[in-house]
Design a protein with these regions (language model features):
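N-terminal, intrinsically disordered, polar/charged segments of Gram-positive cell-envelope systems
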Residues: 1-20
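Short, hydrophobic/aromatic-rich segments at coil-to-beta transitions
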Residues: 14-24, 70-71, 81
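Domain-level marker for long, solvent-exposed, non-transmembrane regions
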Residues: 18-19, 44, 126
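A cross-family detector of function-defining hotspots
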Residues: 23-28, 85
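Short, cysteine-centered beta-strand-loop-beta hairpins and adjacent loop/turn segments enriched
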Residues: 28-29, 53-60, 102-110
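Short, surface-exposed coil-to-beta transition loops
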Residues: 29-35
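Alpha-helical segments in soluble extracytoplasmic regions
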Residues: 36-77
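Mature, soluble, non-transmembrane domains
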Residues: 75, 79-143
């Protein structure tokens, strides 16, 4: 029937239902964080983070900052659905992180990084995330 055709088309064309929200935090001296949430309804389906740390402002060497970030986020290493790179670029330390919640296990993420993934259940709520981000000093960028 036509109806089943339409619904299977919709699921392959995710662009209609997903929205992207970008949050930026410059309130921590020496660190600029940009988070991009891909959201379907209230469910976060993907989260990307780009953190740029300026060692000069932080009063440390790029190598020290890099190892601090590696240590702090080592819980992400080896988790399925998670891609992370931490590198020194032009004297700054750049962390890129992508979490695909359709693949990642939220209980694993919680175990690895409890302070980053609070709450219960096996989904990430966008409205809860947004509140938490605003408390941390993030502001949503509107296009």
């Amino acid at each position: 029937s036509n109806e089943t055709k339409q619904s299977s088309q919709q699921s392959s064309e995710k662009k209609e239902t997903t929205k992207t929200h970008t949050f930026v935090n410059k309130s921590n001296s020496g660190i600029t964080s940009t988070l991009i949430y891909t959201v379907e309804g209230d469910n976060v389906i993907k989260q990307s983070a780009n953190n740029i740390a300026d060692p000069e402002i932080l009063g440390a060497t790029p190598e020290d900052v890099k190892s601090f970030i590696e240590e702090k986020y080592k819980g992400y290493n080896g988790l399925k659905g998670v891609k992370q790179t931490i590198e020194i670029k032009d004297g700054k330390v750049v962390q890129d992180l992508e979490v695909d919640f359709s693949v990642a296990s939220i209980s694993e993420l919680r175990k690895a990084l409890p302070e980053e993934y609070s709450g219960i259940g096996n989904r990430v709520s966008f409205s809860n995330s947004k509140k938490a981000l605003e408390k941390m000093g993030f502001t949503e960028k509107t296009n």
